Swiss-Prot record:
Keywords: Cytoplasm, Exonuclease, Hydrolase, Nuclease. Its EC number is 3.1.11.6. Bidirectionally degrades single-stranded DNA into large acid-insoluble oligonucleotides, which are then degraded further into small acid-soluble oligonucleotides. It is found in: Cytoplasm. Belongs to the XseA family. This is Exodeoxyribonuclease 7 large subunit. Pfam families: Exonuc_VII_L, tRNA_anti_2. It catalyses: Exonucleolytic cleavage in either 5'- to 3'- or 3'- to 5'-direction to yield nucleoside 5'-phosphates. It comes from Shouchella clausii (strain KSM-K16). One of its GO terms (biological process) is DNA catabolic process.
Length: 458
C-alpha cells in the first residue's frame, strides 16, 4: 500500500521541469553571470536569433542570443572564437534542457588591448602630442580636401554626398587605404605623408566606419597617431561611431563623431553663405540710407541757420560754403559707397571664388544699379536744394532796405541813430543822409513839421 501511495504522488515531466526552472530562477547567482568559453555549432536563424554552444575543456552548454540583443554586437561571432558572454541560465521547458540566454557578447582577450590603449594614450599625452595649443583651426572655406579611407563602402559615399550637397564647388581627392588588418597602420601613415607632401590640400579627413575594437585598432597605433600630428595641414579624425574614441582622435586637430559629421565640419553650407551675403547687403543698404538721412538733416539745419541769421551781404559767401559742404557730402558718400563696395567685393571673392558665375554676375549687376540710383538721387536732391536757396536769396533781396534806396529813397541819421520824425532834430544839428551810392553830411538850417494835414514852420 505504501508503494501505491508513492506512485500516486508522482510528478509529471512538466511539473518536474517547471520546478527545476523555478529553482534556477530563484538562485541569486544565476540570473546575471559572465561565462568565458569557445564558440561552436554557431548558426544564425533567418529571424536574427543566434544559436550556439559555449564550451571549454571540461564541459559544454547550449546557448541562445536573441536578435534584440545581438543587433548591438560590434563583431561577427564565428566557430572557434573565444568569447565572454553575459546573461542568465534557465530551462527550455519543451526539451527539459537548461541553456544560457546571452544578452551581451565580446571577444575574449580585449583586456590586453585596452591596457595597450591606455599605455600609449598616457605616453603620448605626457609627450604633449594631444595638447590643445598644438591644434590647428579648420579652414572656413577650403577649396581642396583629402579623404583617407577605404575606397569602397558607405563611408566614402556618405561623405561625398554630404560634401557636394553642402559645398558643390569643393574638390576632393581620395587616398584609398586599408582601414583594418595588419597592413592598415602603414597604409594610413603613408597616405598622410603623401597628402602633406602634395601641398595642395586645405584639410585632411581620416575616416572609417564603426567596428569592434580589433577592427578599429589600426587607428590606435603610435605610427598613425604621429603621422596625424606631423601632418602639414589640419586633420579631422572620424573613426567609428560617436561612442568610439581612438588614439587618432586625440592626435587630430578635430574629432568628428562620424564620417558624415566630419564632412559637415570640413565645409560650410553654401545656402547659409548666400543668406549671410543677403544679410550683409541689407545692412549696407540700411547704412547708406541712414547716411543720406543724416546729411539731409544737416543740410536743413544749415539752410535754416544761414538764411535768417546773417545779413544779405554774406549770402553769397554762405552759398559758396554750402556748395563746399555739398561737395564734401558727395565725396563722403562716394568714398563710403566705394569702401562698402570694395569690402563687399572682397567678401564675395573670399567666400564665393568658385560659386556659379551667373549668381556672381547677378550680384554685381544689382550693386551697379543700386550705385547708379544712389548717385542720381543725390544729384537731384543737390539741385533741388540749390534752387530753394536761390529763391530765398531773391526774397531777402526784395525785402532789403538797400533795394528800396535804389529807387531814390534815403535814410537820415543823427548821431548814428535813425531819424524817424522832424522832432528828432533841431536847427543847426549835424545829420547824415544815406543814399544808395553814398552818404551826405548836412546841417539843419530849418524844419517844417506836418500837423493835421497842414504845415508848421520852425
Amino acid at each position: 500500500m505504501a508503494g501505491n501511495a508513492g506512485v500516486a504522488e508522482a510528478w509529471t515531466v512538466s511539473e518536474a521541469t517547471r520546478y527545476i526552472k523555478q529553482l534556477l530562477e530563484d538562485d541569486p547567482h544565476l540570473p546575471e553571470i559572465w561565462i568565458r568559453g569557445e564558440l561552436s555549432n554557431f548558426k544564425q536563424h533567418t529571424r536574427g536569433h543566434m544559436y550556439f554552444t559555449i564550451k571549454d575543456e571540461g564541459s559544454r552548454m547550449q546557448a541562445v542570443m536573441f536578435a534584440g540583443y545581438n543587433r548591438f554586437l560590434r563583431f561577427k561571432p564565428e566557430n572557434g572564437m573565444n568569447v565572454l558572454i553575459r546573461g542568465e541560465i534557465n530551462v527550455y521547458e519543451p526539451y527539459g534542457q537548461y541553456q544560457f540566454y546571452a544578452k551581451e557578447m565580446q571577444p575574449d582577450g580585449i583586456g590586453s588591448l585596452f591596457a595597450e590603449y591606455e599605455r600609449l594614450k598616457k605616453a603620448l599625452e605626457a609627450e604633449g602630442l594631444f595638447a590643445e595649443e598644438r591644434k590647428r583651426p579648420i579652414p572656413r572655406f577650403p577649396t581642396h580636401i583629402a579623404i583617407i579611407t577605404s575606397p569602397t563602402g558607405a563611408v566614402i559615399r556618405d561623405m561625398m554626398t554630404t560634401l557636394k550637397r553642402r559645398y558643390p564647388q569643393i574638390r576632393v581627392t581620395l587616398f584609398p587605404v586599408l582601414v583594418q588588418g595588419e597592413g592598415a597602420p602603414l597604409s594610413i601613415s603613408r597616405a598622410l605623408e603623401q597628402a602633406s607632401m602634395a601641398n595642395i590640400f586645405d584639410v585632411v579627413i581620416v575616416a572609417r566606419g564603426g567596428g569592434s575594437i580589433e577592427e578599429l585598432w589600426a587607428f590606435n597605433e603610435e605610427m598613425v597617431a604621429r603621422a596625424i600630428a606631423e601632418a602639414a595641414v589640419p586633420v579631422i579624425s572620424a573613426v567609428g561611431h560617436e561612442t568610439d574614441f581612438t588614439i587618432s582622435d586625440f592626435a587630430a586637430d578635430r574629432r568628428a563623431p562620424t564620417p558624415t559629421a566630419a564632412a559637415e565640419f570640413a565645409v560650410p553650407d553654401a545656402r547659409e553663405l548666400m543668406e549671410h551675403i543677403g544679410h550683409l547687403k541689407k545692412r549696407l543698404e540700411r547704412s547708406l540710407v541712414e547716411q543720406v538721412k543724416t546729411r539731409r538733416r544737416e543740410l536743413e539745419r544749415l539752410k535754416r541757420s544761414y538764411a535768417f541769421r546773417y545779413p544779405v551781404q554774406l549770402v553769397h559767401q554762405k552759398e559758396q560754403q554750402l556748395d563746399g559742404l555739398m561737395e564734401r557730402l558727395n565725396r563722403a558718400m562716394q568714398i563710403k559707397l566705394e569702401q562698402k563696395t570694395l569690402a563687399f567685393k572682397h567678401m564675395n571673392q573670399a567666400i564665393l571664388r568658385q560659386h556659379p558665375a551667373t549668381r556672381v554676375s547677378q550680384l554685381q549687376k544689382e550693386r551697379r544699379q543700386n550705385h547708379a540710383r544712389l548717385v542720381r538721387a543725390m544729384a537731384a536732391e543737390t539741385q533741388r536744394k540749390r534752387q530753394s536757396l536761390s529763391a530765398v536769396i531773391q526774397q531777402l533781396q526784395l525785402l532789403s532796405p538797400l533795394a528800396v534806396m535804389d529807387r531814390g529813397y534815403s535814410l537820415v541819421y543823427k548821431d548814428e541813430a535813425l531819424v524817424k520824425t522832424a522832432k528828432d532834430v533841431e536847427i543847426e544839428d549835424d545829420i547824415v543822409v544815406k543814399l544808395a551810392d553814398g552818404n551826405l553830411h548836412c546841417q539843419v538850417v530849418g524844419k517844417r513839421e506836418m500837423k493835421n494835414g497842414g504845415e508848421s514852420n520852425g
